[in-house]
């Protein structure tokens, strides 16, 4: 994985003059790409790259250039192609000659051969930019699921793009201004974001499954066109349950196996839950067959056993199931235990990684965890997206929550709004703002005619989770891992799994009334029975009261500063009440963000406003 950035301008003098800014942009990507740096400046184009070397360590440097068919193509790319060998063979048969075995070179030749249509052939996670020097045209693309990020901004006669917001903000033409809509996204939807919203004024994120072209004509102004090249489409499911389970098994096995390819050490996350355990078991078999030992990693918290208590969302601790998996696998396992003080301190660094207030200690713990894994491995596999695709969250199966209007993971609008001064929303009605995003997603959901109300609603639930909640988790995983110089791959995000599962009837997914029952039945024999049928438990959080004390002290300290930016938008009385309130049962967001995490989120919000010098406009 890597970091990319660049600028295309109708004025070539602007490109030459902005070289110092490009150096700052490149430096801001150093954590995403600590191994190599490259830059291409010519005429109307500046392309910037920072590399984390994973495949073909010597020959995969970027920007990569190809002269072919009278055109010169320059590529910067962040991602991995999991079908690179097949594409390499196909392109070689068409006469292409390669000098490396890097997937970067495969992608470059694929674009030269097929142009934008190459996207239909790619299986992977990616965000990339190709500059066609003679045609004076930039092509941008993002993977179907949205695993890899890509932000952009139009400024006059220029388009500026980058993997991360911090990199865009290094450019002198992109000040850290946030208007009412951007602030509403942070305060009302955070840590989620409206699809395509870059929060900062006039900054957008290229949506998953989309591509864009920016052309600099000889006469007239540059033109930007954005189009969707992939979306989930409902169709009649052709298979009975037995064939469906067999197909799911094949898809999951293939997705995991493809994503184990690397020229650097590979590890897996292992929580003792279904998803990470499946990935670890498949990877372990692959490694063992080749005489290698898999590295697995688990995260926990000091004294958590002492303070843990079961909830609707977290019914059981992870440790017993991790021990079961350790005995089952041939892997070498590492336990990572985080203390409360380090977890609280890392909240600020997690904002530096995400460039926005995030998921509080759900972010900071992952950041610290990835940092430990990076000491041993450069690549890790993780279980994100299985719950969205197979229907694993409680709100899929709780009829009351499922049928309730609004985002099922964010049912606290009135509670949220009460923390903020009314004027900060600039005339935006909070409930209407949230409703707009919810309704837009339902209107765009593909539902074939003739489905019963339950099946219709489950398509909507799939789309809501896929386009909103899952994107928040993918943002988290990308930013926290890449900030640590660790590439994390997510096999359940294989687009073939999403395409196949979208139209599978709910009665199959909910096989015998079990959450993710289809996945469990499909993977019989891969895991110990007690792990295969373990009730879902989310990413672990700390229950140690020392963490609540630490984040409460941080928020109180911030509130003692009369110039604290948080106090310009939040009500002091509401914050003080939060600091003395009992822990809430209903999460602020998702499954984990109860009172300690809400306090921590306000700490992050204050730090973000201050560190990024956010100007509210």
Where are these regions (language model features)?
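A mobile, often basic/glycine-rich helix-loop segment
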Residues: 390-415
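Short acidic/histidine-rich active-site segments
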Residues: 377-387, 391-393
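Cysteine-centered catalytic environments shared across enzyme families
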Residues: 1-353, 366, 525, 530
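Phosphate/ATP-binding catalytic cores across multiple sugar-kinase/actin-like superfamilies
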Residues: 246-268, 372-376, 380, 473, ...
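Adenosyl-5′-phosphate
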Residues: 1-4, 23-24, 72, 93, ...
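Short secondary-structure boundary/capping segments
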Residues: 311-314, 350-352, 394-401, 617
């Amino acid at each position: 994985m890597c970091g990319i950035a660049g600028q295309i301008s109708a004025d070539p003098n602007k490109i030459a003059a902005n070289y110092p800014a490009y150096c700052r942009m490149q430096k801001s990507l150093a954590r995403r790409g600590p191994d190599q740096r490259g830059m291409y400046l010519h005429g109307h184009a500046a392309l910037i790259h920072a590399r984390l070397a994973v495949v073909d360590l010597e020959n995969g440097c970027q920007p990569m250039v190809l002269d072919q068919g009278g055109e010169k193509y320059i590529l910067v790319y962040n991602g991995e192609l999991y079908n690179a060998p097949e594409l390499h063979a196909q392109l070689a048969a068409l006469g292409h000659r390669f000098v490396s075995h890097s997937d970067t070179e495969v992608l470059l030749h694929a674009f030269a051969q097929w142009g934008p249509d190459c996207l239909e052939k790619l299986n992977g996670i990616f965000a990339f930019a190709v500059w066609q020097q003679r045609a004076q045209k930039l092509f941008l693309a993002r993977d179907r699921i949205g695993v890899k990020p890509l932000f952009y901004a139009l400024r006059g006669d220029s388009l500026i793009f980058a993997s991360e917001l911090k990199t865009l903000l290094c450019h002198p033409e992109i000040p850290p201004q946030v208007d009412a809509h951007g602030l509403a996204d942070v305060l009302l939807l955070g840590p989620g974001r409206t699809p395509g919203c870059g929060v900062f004024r006039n900054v957008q994120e290229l949506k998953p499954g989309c591509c864009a072209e920016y052309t600099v004509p000889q006469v007239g102004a540059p033109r930007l066109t954005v189009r969707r090249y992939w979306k989930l489409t409902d169709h009649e499911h052709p298979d009975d349950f037995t064939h469906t389970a067999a197909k799911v098994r094949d898809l999951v096995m293939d997705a995991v196996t493809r994503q184990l390819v690397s020229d650097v050490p590979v590890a897996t996350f292992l929580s003792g839950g279904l998803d990470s355990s499946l990935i670890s078991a498949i990877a372990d078999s692959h490694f063992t067959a080749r005489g290698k030992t898999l590295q697995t990693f688990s995260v926990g918290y000091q004294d958590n056993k002492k303070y843990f208590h079961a909830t609707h969302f977290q019914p059981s601790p992870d440790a017993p199931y991790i021990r079961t998996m350790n005995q089952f696998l041939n892997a070498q396992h590492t336990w990572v235990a985080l203390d409360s003080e380090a977890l609280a301190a890392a909240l600020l660094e997690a904002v530096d990684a995400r460039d926005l207030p995030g998921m509080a200690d759900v972010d900071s713990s992952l950041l610290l965890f990835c940092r430990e894994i990076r000491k041993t491995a450069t690549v890790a596999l993780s279980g994100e997206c299985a719950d969205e695709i197979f229907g694993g969250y409680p709100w899929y199966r709780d009829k009351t929550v499922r049928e309730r209007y609004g985002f099922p993971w964010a049912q606290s609008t009135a509670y949220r709004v009460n923390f903020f001064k009314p004027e900060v929303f600039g005339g935006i009605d909070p409930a209407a703002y949230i409703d707009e995003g919810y309704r837009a997603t339902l209107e765009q959901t593909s539902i074939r005619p003739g489905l019963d109300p339950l099946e219709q609603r489950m398509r909507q639930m799939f789309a809501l989770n896929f386009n909103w909640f899952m994107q928040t988790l993918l943002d988290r995983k990308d930013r926290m891992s890449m900030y640590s110089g660790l590439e994390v791959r997510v096999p359940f995000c294989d687009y073939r799994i999403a395409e196949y599962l979208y139209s599978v009837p709910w009665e199959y997914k909910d096989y015998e009334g079990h959450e993710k029952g289809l996945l469990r039945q499909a993977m019989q024999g891969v895991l110990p029975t007690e792990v295969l049928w373990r009730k879902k438990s989310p990413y672990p959080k700390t229950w140690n009261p020392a963490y609540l004390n630490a984040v409460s002290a941080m928020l109180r300290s911030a509130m003692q500063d009369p110039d604290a930016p948080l106090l310009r938008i939040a009500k002091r009385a509401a914050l003080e009440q939060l600091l003395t309130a009992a822990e809430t049962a209903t999460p602020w967001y998702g499954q984990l963000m109860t009172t300690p995490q809400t306090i921590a989120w306000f700490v992050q919000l204050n730090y973000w406003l201050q560190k990024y010098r956010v100007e509210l406009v």
